[in-house]
């Protein structure tokens, strides 16, 4: 699809979204065709909700988020096959694997272990491995990435190459508010078991999050070496663990208020060290 075609497609979707109250399951023609085309492009990985520039800046293609939102208005509730014992679900979004045969799976080149759930319009790159996990619509999972058991990749989340999302990890989805960016895990990151990264936060390339690290937009990210406090983004090649810091407040009884949770950057490593050092060794203090 040419840039001109994409521009035309995005304009149709932008216009439809402005008058979205008029869009329904009975809508036909250009709007439905445009939304279907956008979902197919997302599903095939030919377009992404967010793209990384050469300078590291992520640009969000808001029109693709709007296409996903419009699809909820266009599609009726229907039976979705694939439940245990031939049971069914009731939803507006089909499985990515609906109608797939051996040929489609071989062409896609990733592993989909029984009981993983991937909704249509999510892209899974070759050599990725999906354990019993959940990947929501509009998400992107990069080449060679492992999505471990009970991990969740939220709507429109962007997961890079050679990432390991450990068991029970939650990567938050962001469809609304419209201006919000998606949650992003860049290439070669390791996210420890039961950790959560949400609300459009970014974990930059090569970073390691220990088990049980929770990062949202309001979470303090403290560099232990410098004392610097930042929000919303983990710098490249950071090793991060869960911690706490003084709240700076005093309770009514005169005692110091409890410490508050934070994420602590315990060290930073270069690319060479990161590639040669085991995860457990990096996390040892």
Swiss-Prot record:
Pathway: Amino-acid biosynthesis; L-lysine biosynthesis via DAP pathway; LL-2,6-diaminopimelate from (S)-tetrahydrodipicolinate (succinylase route): step 1/3. Substrate binds at residues 111, 148. It is found in: Cytoplasm. Keywords: Acyltransferase, Amino-acid biosynthesis, Cytoplasm, Diaminopimelate biosynthesis, Lysine biosynthesis, Repeat, Transferase. It is an enzyme of class 2 (transferase). GO terms for molecular function: 2,3,4,5-tetrahydropyridine-2,6-dicarboxylate N-succinyltransferase activity. The keyword Acyltransferase applies. Its main location: cytoplasm. One of its GO terms (cellular component) is cytoplasm. It catalyses: (S)-2,3,4,5-tetrahydrodipicolinate + succinyl-CoA + H2O = (S)-2-succinylamino-6-oxoheptanedioate + CoA. GO terms for biological process: diaminopimelate biosynthetic process; lysine biosynthetic process via diaminopimelate. The keyword Repeat applies. Its EC number is 2.3.1.117. Belongs to the transferase hexapeptide repeat family. Homotrimer. NCBIfam families: dapD, PRK11830.1. This is 2,3,4,5-tetrahydropyridine-2,6-dicarboxylate N-succinyltransferase. The gene is dapD.
